[in-house]
Amino acid sequence: MQRVHTITAVTEDGESLRFECRSDEDVITAALRQNIFLMSSCREGGCATCKALCSEGDYDLKGCSVQALPPEEEEEGLVLLCRTYPKTDLEIELPYTHCRISFGEVGSFEAEVVGLNWVSSNTVQFLLQKRPDECGNRGVKFEPGQFMDLTIPGTDVSRSYSPANLPNPEGRLEFLIRVLPEGRFSDYLRNDARVGQVLSVKGPLGVFGLKERGMAPRYFVAGGTGLAPVVSMVRQMQEWTAPNETRIYFGVNTEPELFYIDELKSLERSMRNLTVKACVWHPSGDWEGEQGSPIDALREDLESSDANPDIYLCGPPGMIDAACELVRSRGIPGEQVFFEKFLPSGAA
């Protein structure tokens, strides 16, 4: 018999929220049904974005990737909320702060594919044009740093990506998407995506974005396609003619993976307070830019100055964790560090 259980979710900063979850639905689906947007992405147990600790209660855990949830983590009580079905009331410990949870109804719209451009060996620039709504409006609204869910045509498979451009009345959307060897959306981009196709788009979602702290310098650290929300935020600063000292540390593994360099140089030329450092972890002998990770470049700059910047991070968890450890060691308060983790996986 179907039962209804209470989920108590406690965030990293000690805030809590409660919602109901039926025994035949997973925790993420139940939260969404009640207009609570916990962090998630693939919703198929493959990417680990919704990983959390279940500290109390019994549940069924169904169909998780061992890469996303290794057996030793499962034994410790870690779960993927998109695959967690409650058998009793549950208490969940979320590994992020309350401000990263979105609430309320989220709109959706249709958008047409107008461009599909390979900009590096593993990255696609995916361009969409919002279709007019019932009033004829095309405009697309979001805060730079937020993300949207894109659904593969003819399926219910969706993935989350952040626009690299700014909100605009023309309804244009630009996404920078890493194409993996395996994965539903990666396969779609590689094999099936065509100009003229129509996708369902939900959003905006998320709370990653610029925080107002006066004239504090802003340092942005981006790993791979984590560059997209960073570029959107810096473009907003450009539009506002923000005078803050600004730096972008952009990292990839090899030179063929580099992308968006011309656009970054253009931003650097137009913003007198902006410095861009492109970093390659395994460079060739001809590479003349930064060698190593963007964390290495950030460390060098922090050690050579007395700056007390706000730090914005977007990229894989390992990069985020290393950056957070670095800034803590430099005495930068946690309230000056803002980040968006993403976890590329076979489910992406």
UniProtKB/Swiss-Prot annotation:
Its cofactor is [2Fe-2S] cluster. The keyword Electron transport applies. One of its GO terms (biological process) is one-carbon metabolic process. It is an enzyme of class 1 (oxidoreductase). Residues 5-98 form the 2Fe-2S ferredoxin-type domain. Keywords: 2Fe-2S, Electron transport, FAD, Flavoprotein, Iron, Iron-sulfur, Metal-binding, Monooxygenase, NADP, One-carbon metabolism, Oxidoreductase, Transport. InterPro entries: 2Fe-2S_ferredoxin-like_sf, 2Fe-2S_ferredoxin-type, 2Fe2S_fd_BS, Beta-grasp_dom_sf, Cbr1-like_FAD-bd_dom, FAD-bd_FR_type, Flavoprot_Pyr_Nucl_cyt_Rdtase, FNR_nucleotide-bd. This is Methane monooxygenase component C. The gene is mmoC.
